């Protein structure tokens, strides 16, 4: 867990590249494989800029998704107050899954069927990020792989054994937004990114049919 990761120096941030990609760390010439399951979760404060450093593109590309939390709703705010009213709820945490169950779940996504049409849909979306006039840095091949993985996981959570175009569309923003560099940023970057991504999605034809793992049209 990297809290406010953009406060780390570029040298410290670069040290994460090996463990994020290769699941290993090298110290003084000695390489150690990291135990599984392993993942990197980081937070970033977009408001404060003093004492912060921009995250390099190579590091951003290794984060599967980026989610903006925003402020809690009224209901969520009340629930937070209730939980912290008497004691810190973090003091009473129970595991919800074993290590083996997590590893098995991580392996299951690769079994989710993806039709040729959906694969082409993913690639066309990614290619559009490289051709859009407002984008100076488009999505890399690693980003297209991340979009595929996220769509497969989305299908699992929705109770299906195949990926639909909607799974892909719903994952475009969290998977691709942080991988894109806009040419001219005037005002709020987030708003401009949303507009650009919407333009890309509207410009790529959606496959007319989803095909399940047994070959049935749906």
PLM feature spans:
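C-terminal engagement/docking regions of AAA+ P-loop ATPases
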Residues: 131-218
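Canonical AAA+ ATPase core
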Residues: 7-8, 12-15, 20-97, 102-112, ...
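Walker B beta-strand of ABC/ABC-like P-loop ATPase nucleotide-binding domains
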Residues: 1-4
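Conserved AAA+ ATPase small/helical "lid" subdomain
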Residues: 92-147
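Short acidic/histidine-centered micro-motifs embedded in hydrophobic/aromatic stretches
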Residues: 19, 83, 125, 170-174, ...
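Alpha-helical structural signal
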Residues: 13, 37, 60-61, 77, ...
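Alpha-helix N-cap and coil->helix boundary residues
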Residues: 55, 76, 113, 117, ...
């Amino acid at each position: 867990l990297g809290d406010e990761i953009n406060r780390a120096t570029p040298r410290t941030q670069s040290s994460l590249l090996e463990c994020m990609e290769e699941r290993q760390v090298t110290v003084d010439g000695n390489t150690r494989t990291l135990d599984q399951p392993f993942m990197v979760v980081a937070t970033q404060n977009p408001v404060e800029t003093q004492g912060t450093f921009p995250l390099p593109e190579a590091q951003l590309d290794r984060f599967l998704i980026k989610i903006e939390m925003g402020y809690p709703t009224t209901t969520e705010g009340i629930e937070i107050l209730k939980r912290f009213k008497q004691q810190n709820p973090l003091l009473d945490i129970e595991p919800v899954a074993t290590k083996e169950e997590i590893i098995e779940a991580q392996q299951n996504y690769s079994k989710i069927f993806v039709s040729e049409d959906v694969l082409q849909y993913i690639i066309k979306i990614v290619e559009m990020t490289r051709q859009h006039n407002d984008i100076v840095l488009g999505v890399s091949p690693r980003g297209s792989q991340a979009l595929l993985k996220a769509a497969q996981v989305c299908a699992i959570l929705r109770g299906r054994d195949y990926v639909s175009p909607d799974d892909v569309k719903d994952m475009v923003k969290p998977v691709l937004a942080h991988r894109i560099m806009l040419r001219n940023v005037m005002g709020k970057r987030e708003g401009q990114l949303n507009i650009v991504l919407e333009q890309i999605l509207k410009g790529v034809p959606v496959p007319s049919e989803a095909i399940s793992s047994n070959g049935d049209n749906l």
